[in-house]
């Protein structure tokens, strides 16, 4: 079994663990209503995704 030759320094440990740290999700403002939404998702308030209206797409799929 392999064993480490040197002790890992505190800086190496901290930089390695920094990649696992929790980060707040990045939000953007909706172009239509201005509410904050996560990226690459439809707006929960108005239902738009970029230029397309999500509510119209759902209604067409049901009909």
Curated annotation (Swiss-Prot):
Record-level GO BP terms: translation
Query: Molecular function terms in GO for this entry?
Result: structural constituent of ribosome
Q: Which InterPro entries match?
A: Ribosomal_bL32, Ribosomal_bL32_bact, Ribosomal_zn-bd
Q: Which UniProt keywords apply?
A: Ribonucleoprotein, Ribosomal protein
Query: SUPFAM superfamilies, per this entry?
Result: Zn-binding ribosomal proteins (SSF57829)
Q: Give any Gene Ontology cellular component.
A: large ribosomal subunit
* Pfam families listed in its UniProt record: Ribosomal_L32p (PF01783)
UniProt signal peptide: none
Q: Does the keyword Iron apply?
A: no
Alphabetized NCBIfam families for the sequence: rpmF_bact (TIGR01031)
Its family remark reads: Belongs to the bacterial ribosomal protein bL32 family.
Q: Please state what the protein is called.
A: Large ribosomal subunit protein bL32
Q: Specify the species.
A: Akkermansia muciniphila (strain ATCC BAA-835 / DSM 22959 / JCM 33894 / BCRC 81048 / CCUG 64013 / CIP 107961 / Muc)
């Amino acid at each position: 079994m392999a064993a480490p030759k040197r002790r890992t320094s505190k800086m190496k440990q901290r930089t390695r663990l920094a990649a696992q740290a929790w980060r707040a999700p990045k939000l953007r403002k909706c172009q239509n209503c201005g509410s904050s939404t996560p990226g690459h998702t439809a707006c929960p308030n108005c239902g738009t995704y970029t230029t397309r209206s999500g509510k119209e797409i759902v209604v067409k799929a049901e009909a």
